[in-house]
């Protein structure tokens, strides 16, 4: 229907009337407009893909202080970002009079409009969680690539036809070359209701931590249906933010309350970073179904498997990676002897199958083997050599954060005497080599020392 309407209602939008824009895109109806730009529904001449085209008037931009750098920032930021929850910039076109940003089409509108259409202007906590974890995933990706959004608000969060989130409008984004010598940003920008207190007070600030505050405001809005602080008076709003004078409705769960509190921390030094939420906060965790995710791996029992006499494996969201060498006495290690547990965590967007496969390949060099059978986890001894430490097992637990993001937890069990006293690392186990072997499968490592409850 949209494409038929486009054909019937081609408009003159700066793209040459009824002629395809630079021979590449047929412009249709207007989707929205701002001070200096209009956004049109369009269709690619080659292939027929539906896209959105943002048409920017050069004369108006050049005649307004600060607008030309903003357009350049938006293009520079979007060109370096390729993520399922970040609106994609396909290409940039230009004529003498106009600039055209050809972007991914988000047919679901913006988050603010979606909330406004609801009777109570809020989401159930489960639905709010789904939206919010996608937002956190997108911003974590941006921050890892040196991009701080600086204008995170529901109007700039779009939705596709399936309700998946797309962060948009990077016109105020800060790139690494925006930082001063002190490594901070100094330009106050954004929307006051969603801006961090340090930004409103025009102090030097960390762009990623400012985005974290904005995420806290959005989470509050998703759960409560209104802003945490009245924005009719900015000075009063800033005072209330510093005093944490907000109140969540009684139906909001305690884990969600704690998360809002950590995000709406007026002190940016103690405010939680969005990058740490997926790995560390319990509100984000959701168990994977191993039967559905790893069905292709369960192809029968290994022919050389030896029964592993230990506590039964955890429920269907866990695997054991068994590490052993000839002569290693497993019974002593899994008896009543003192043990130390060392953990590492990382996040990945690879599939569970791919992650487990890569762990298995790494095991060939580090002296362990991954075994998943119909009866559960079993031992498969490796031939040759002796490990330099009394490693008994390393379990791997995968939890779904938000598709396709997984949290992978590695727990290494060793005899107490095989742990160095200095840094708590396990003697002889090559964590650094494991990091190298996993390579691009790992999105980010999260140290165990940071695993305090958020």
Curated annotation (Swiss-Prot):
Catalytically driven reaction(s): L-seryl-[protein] + ATP = O-phospho-L-seryl-[protein] + ADP + H(+); L-threonyl-[protein] + ATP = O-phospho-L-threonyl-[protein] + ADP + H(+)
PROSITE patterns: NAF, PROTEIN_KINASE_ATP, PROTEIN_KINASE_DOM, PROTEIN_KINASE_ST
Catalytic site: 151
Highest taxon, organism lineage: Eukaryota
Residues of the NAF domain: 311-335
Keyword ATP-binding annotated: yes
GO MF annotation, one: ATP binding
GO terms classed as biological process: signal transduction
Residue segments, region Activation loop: 169-198
Record-linked CDD domains: CIPK_C
Binding residues for ATP: 31-39, 54
Coiled coil, from the record: none
Kinase recorded as keyword: yes
Matches recorded under Pfam families: NAF, Pkinase
Region named PPI: 341-370
Protein name: CBL-interacting protein kinase 4
Species annotation: Oryza sativa subsp. japonica (Rice)
Phylogenetic placement of the source organism: Eukaryota, Viridiplantae, Streptophyta, Embryophyta, Tracheophyta
